Amino acid sequence: MKTTLLAVIGMSPAVITETLYGLHGRGDVWPDNIKVITTAVGAQKLIQQLINANPLHQLCHELGKPDISFTAADILVVPGSDGVPVADARSTEDHEALANFIVTTVRDVTRNNSERIHASIAGGRKTMTFYLGYAMSLFGRRFDSMSHVLVSEGYENHPEFFFPTRSPQLLQLRDGRTLDASDATITLADIPFIRQRHLVPQLLKEFRETVNFRELVELINLGEDPAAIRLSVYTQSRQVKITSVYEPQLAVTVQISNPWHWALYVLLAEESIRDEADRGSYGRPQSSKADEALAAEMALKLAELNGLELLGDSVSALLTELIEQDDLWTNHPNLERSLVAVKEKGGITGDQFSTYINTLQTELAAKLPANLVLVIAPGQTFDEQGELLAVTGRIKNRGGFYGIPLPDASQQIRFVVD
């Protein structure tokens, strides 16, 4: 497995060589390559002090380690809000862009599971180190690591000090004193971090769109405060929009692809806003018998959502009418397969029901944090009396009935006919 040293750097390129020295000193894996996130000014410092002067080669030689190729292509310059590389992030907009860039970079380098990351938060502005640390918490894997480097007094930030040399090397201080580089000590402090990669929406982990750091954090925070969620169900366009009572600008929309699955979602959302005494209609069908009543309700709901009137007096007849509606399923080939499968079974089986629920959860998880999905995706929500279960969502409760497990669904869910 290859190792990449990923660091944020400000005006002190020596952080790179100091970190490498520290890794060697404690017997850690020697990196194969280096990636540095910095500003335009920091990039010039790196080119002058690490690439042109090349103390990196000297370090590798003294430690008996393989040379690490480091070129200008390995320097990732943070763009401002206008997309132009920044000399220094000063505005609020530039800091937002900086956060997005750092988090996106970490997302990208952690996509390859055959490459481990060692992140250094020893350099750069405080905000840069925070964003790198938090990005590692969001995207870091069990084999990734993070550190800060501690350099003995007097040597830190000295322009001519890069690592403790084997031979004496005198360094002149501003007050006229001298220090010997060979006397310096470097300590690499391991930084433990909570790994929250499981919370991140699946699409953000897989694709190269820029990560909106603020939105991602707000969505994760919203998942920790279910009472603040507001869920708009757009019945015709098969969309749910998630907003927050505390963050008016936050709004994320997810579309459900299969109209048959969407019909079930709408039924369960409607179930969730009913009075307690009227809830508890939708349980997982028994494995021994297909559920005709549920199939009929879903068929009628699908027809209603698409402006159709069904005349059949049996599940088979209702499903046949839907299958014959070419306009309904032409753009949704999975819909025809779903309808035919239910017709062949004479209703909805327990396995089919579980597939519908799992597919809905997966589609929501593609764009939303896992903790948020737990409270807006269908799950076991009610007991036989229609009361909210103490533990809802994906945890299996014997005899539990399905709904949308928001704490006060009647106040949190609204339906929009679009």
Language-model features and meaning:
Residues 121:
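Conserved SAM-binding loop
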Residues 1-117, 130-418:
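Long, low-complexity, Lys/Arg-enriched
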